[in-house]
Amino acid sequence: CILPYNRVVRDLNGLTVKAFLGALKFNFELMLMPGFPCKPVEKHCMGMYVDGQWYHLKAWPDVYEKKDVVGQLDVSILQEKVLSPVLGIEDPRTDQRISFVGGSHKAAELAELADKTGGVAFVMYPTSMEDLMKIADESKLMPPKSTWFEPKLRSGLFIHKL
Protein backbone atom coordinates (compact mmCIF):
# COMPACT_ATOMS: atom_id res chain seq x y z
CA CYS A 1 0.00 0.00 0.00
CA ILE A 2 1.36 3.45 -0.90
CA LEU A 3 1.04 5.98 1.90
CA PRO A 4 2.08 9.63 1.93
CA TYR A 5 5.48 10.75 3.12
CA ASN A 6 4.66 13.80 5.24
CA ARG A 7 6.93 16.74 6.03
CA VAL A 8 7.68 18.79 9.14
CA VAL A 9 9.74 21.97 8.84
CA ARG A 10 11.33 23.26 12.05
CA ASP A 11 10.74 26.98 11.44
CA LEU A 12 9.06 29.47 9.12
CA ASN A 13 12.32 30.85 7.71
CA GLY A 14 12.00 34.07 9.72
CA LEU A 15 8.43 34.77 8.59
CA THR A 16 5.51 35.52 10.86
CA VAL A 17 2.59 33.12 10.60
CA LYS A 18 0.57 35.86 8.88
CA ALA A 19 3.30 36.49 6.29
CA PHE A 20 3.74 32.75 5.73
CA LEU A 21 0.01 32.21 5.12
CA GLY A 22 -0.05 35.26 2.85
CA ALA A 23 2.75 33.82 0.73
CA LEU A 24 0.83 30.57 0.29
CA LYS A 25 -2.28 32.30 -1.08
CA PHE A 26 -0.54 32.94 -4.41
CA ASN A 27 -0.47 29.22 -5.19
CA PHE A 28 -3.11 27.65 -2.94
CA GLU A 29 -6.65 28.04 -1.78
CA LEU A 30 -6.39 28.01 2.03
CA MET A 31 -9.23 26.91 4.26
CA LEU A 32 -8.99 26.95 8.06
CA MET A 33 -10.09 23.62 9.55
CA PRO A 34 -10.60 24.42 13.23
CA GLY A 35 -10.23 21.73 15.83
CA PHE A 36 -9.21 18.64 13.91
CA PRO A 37 -6.39 17.31 11.73
CA CYS A 38 -6.86 17.87 8.03
CA LYS A 39 -6.03 14.86 5.89
CA PRO A 40 -6.25 15.46 2.14
CA VAL A 41 -8.82 13.43 0.24
CA GLU A 42 -7.75 14.20 -3.32
CA LYS A 43 -4.76 14.96 -5.49
CA HIS A 44 -3.30 18.49 -5.38
CA CYS A 45 -4.54 18.96 -1.82
CA MET A 46 -2.65 18.77 1.44
CA GLY A 47 -3.22 19.35 5.10
CA MET A 48 -1.09 21.88 6.92
CA TYR A 49 -0.59 22.57 10.61
CA VAL A 50 0.94 25.81 11.80
CA ASP A 51 0.62 27.85 15.01
CA GLY A 52 -1.98 25.54 16.57
CA GLN A 53 -4.29 25.52 13.54
CA TRP A 54 -5.05 23.03 10.77
CA TYR A 55 -5.55 24.21 7.20
CA HIS A 56 -6.65 22.54 3.99
CA LEU A 57 -4.53 23.64 1.01
CA LYS A 58 -5.62 23.11 -2.58
CA ALA A 59 -3.24 24.05 -5.38
CA TRP A 60 -4.67 26.48 -7.90
CA PRO A 61 -5.01 24.72 -11.31
CA ASP A 62 -2.42 26.95 -12.99
CA VAL A 63 0.24 26.13 -10.36
CA TYR A 64 1.32 22.86 -11.97
CA GLU A 65 1.76 21.60 -15.52
CA LYS A 66 -0.81 18.85 -16.03
CA LYS A 67 1.31 17.07 -18.66
CA ASP A 68 4.44 16.98 -16.47
CA VAL A 69 4.07 13.66 -14.68
CA VAL A 70 6.66 14.56 -12.01
CA GLY A 71 5.84 18.28 -11.73
CA GLN A 72 2.18 17.62 -11.02
CA LEU A 73 2.95 15.38 -8.02
CA ASP A 74 1.89 16.95 -4.74
CA VAL A 75 5.39 16.54 -3.30
CA SER A 76 6.78 18.45 -6.32
CA ILE A 77 4.21 21.22 -5.94
CA LEU A 78 5.06 21.55 -2.25
CA GLN A 79 8.79 21.70 -2.97
CA GLU A 80 8.54 24.16 -5.88
CA LYS A 81 5.87 26.47 -4.44
CA VAL A 82 6.44 26.37 -0.66
CA LEU A 83 9.55 24.64 0.63
CA SER A 84 12.04 26.28 -1.73
CA PRO A 85 10.70 29.81 -2.36
CA VAL A 86 8.96 30.48 0.96
CA LEU A 87 10.77 28.35 3.54
CA GLY A 88 14.21 28.43 1.90
CA ILE A 89 14.65 24.66 1.67
CA GLU A 90 16.50 24.27 -1.62
CA ASP A 91 17.66 20.69 -1.14
CA PRO A 92 15.38 18.59 1.07
CA ARG A 93 17.95 15.77 1.06
CA THR A 94 20.48 17.83 3.02
CA ASP A 95 18.56 20.61 4.79
CA GLN A 96 18.50 19.89 8.52
CA ARG A 97 15.31 21.93 9.02
CA ILE A 98 13.05 19.38 7.33
CA SER A 99 11.99 15.97 8.61
CA PHE A 100 10.09 13.30 6.74
CA VAL A 101 7.45 11.32 8.58
CA GLY A 102 5.99 8.13 7.14
CA GLY A 103 2.29 7.94 6.43
CA SER A 104 1.70 5.37 9.15
CA HIS A 105 2.08 8.14 11.78
CA LYS A 106 -0.97 10.09 12.91
CA ALA A 107 -1.47 13.72 11.95
CA ALA A 108 -1.49 14.65 15.65
CA GLU A 109 2.13 13.46 15.88
CA LEU A 110 3.08 15.85 13.08
CA ALA A 111 1.35 18.70 14.89
CA GLU A 112 3.26 17.88 18.06
CA LEU A 113 6.57 17.99 16.17
CA ALA A 114 5.69 21.34 14.59
CA ASP A 115 4.63 22.80 17.95
CA LYS A 116 7.96 21.86 19.55
CA THR A 117 9.92 24.10 17.18
CA GLY A 118 7.41 26.71 16.03
CA GLY A 119 7.42 25.17 12.58
CA VAL A 120 4.91 23.78 10.14
CA ALA A 121 3.71 20.28 9.24
CA PHE A 122 2.37 19.12 5.88
CA VAL A 123 0.12 16.08 5.50
CA MET A 124 0.44 14.90 1.93
CA TYR A 125 -1.96 13.04 -0.34
CA PRO A 126 -0.34 9.73 -1.33
CA THR A 127 1.19 9.29 -4.76
CA SER A 128 -1.05 7.02 -6.81
CA MET A 129 0.11 3.74 -8.29
CA GLU A 130 -0.90 5.13 -11.69
CA ASP A 131 1.43 8.13 -11.29
CA LEU A 132 4.20 5.89 -9.99
CA MET A 133 3.91 3.67 -13.07
CA LYS A 134 3.77 6.66 -15.48
CA ILE A 135 6.96 8.05 -13.99
CA ALA A 136 8.67 4.68 -14.27
CA ASP A 137 7.45 4.25 -17.86
CA GLU A 138 8.94 7.64 -18.76
CA SER A 139 12.21 6.75 -16.97
CA LYS A 140 11.92 9.82 -14.76
CA LEU A 141 12.88 10.25 -11.12
CA MET A 142 10.49 11.15 -8.33
CA PRO A 143 11.43 13.80 -5.76
CA PRO A 144 13.02 12.44 -2.58
CA LYS A 145 10.68 10.88 -0.03
CA SER A 146 7.69 10.82 -2.39
CA THR A 147 6.21 7.55 -1.16
CA TRP A 148 5.95 5.48 1.99
CA PHE A 149 5.13 1.81 1.60
CA GLU A 150 3.40 -0.34 4.22
CA PRO A 151 3.89 -3.00 5.27
CA LYS A 152 7.67 -2.79 5.18
CA LEU A 153 9.19 -6.00 3.91
CA ARG A 154 12.22 -7.41 5.63
CA SER A 155 15.54 -7.02 3.90
CA GLY A 156 16.42 -10.00 1.71
CA LEU A 157 12.83 -11.16 1.40
CA PHE A 158 12.69 -10.68 -2.36
CA ILE A 159 14.32 -13.26 -4.59
CA HIS A 160 14.34 -12.81 -8.32
CA LYS A 161 15.14 -15.77 -10.55
CA LEU A 162 17.63 -14.88 -13.28
Summary of predicted features, one role per range:
Residues C1-L162:
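Surface-exposed, charge/polar-rich loops and edge strands
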